[in-house]
């Protein structure tokens, strides 16, 4: 497959930066620091685009096996859940505590799932 070890390390470092800026945002409290919040979102968008390009390239060159496809779907669903809960937390309304708890857990599950998926696709 076409995913290099450096590609996996790069994506996982981006995920670490996303989680790190997320901690930075949460420790700052509301209203969120616009600069850090924007950085958090931009790193996330970059990671999603790079992951999508890596997945498409792998699929076009050698195809995705069943495990790779299952991993992509699982990671995608976890990533969507992470983004939805993050979006819910960023609005001015008070959200149920389960939303915060999910947003604290989902990024780690997303990182784990994505790392395993990239390793499978390698």
Task: Annotate each language-model stretch with its function.
Residues 1-122:
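Membrane-embedded alpha-helical bundles that constitute the cytochrome b-like, heme-associated redox core
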């Amino acid at each position: 497959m076409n995913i290099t070890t450096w590609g996996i390390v790069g994506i996982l470092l981006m995920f670490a930066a996303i989680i790190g800026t997320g901690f930075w945002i949460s420790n700052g409290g509301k209203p969120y620091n616009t600069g850090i919040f924007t950085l958090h979102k931009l790193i996330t968008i970059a990671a999603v685009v790079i992951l999508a390009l890596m997945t498409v390239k792998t699929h076009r060159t050698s195809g995705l096996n069943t495990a790779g496809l299952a991993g992509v779907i699982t990671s995608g669903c976890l990533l969507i859940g992470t983004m939805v809960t993050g979006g819910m937390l960023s609005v001015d309304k008070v959200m149920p505590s389960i939303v915060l708890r999910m947003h604290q857990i989902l990024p780690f599950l997303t990182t784990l799932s994505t790392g395993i998926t990239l390793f499978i696709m390698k």
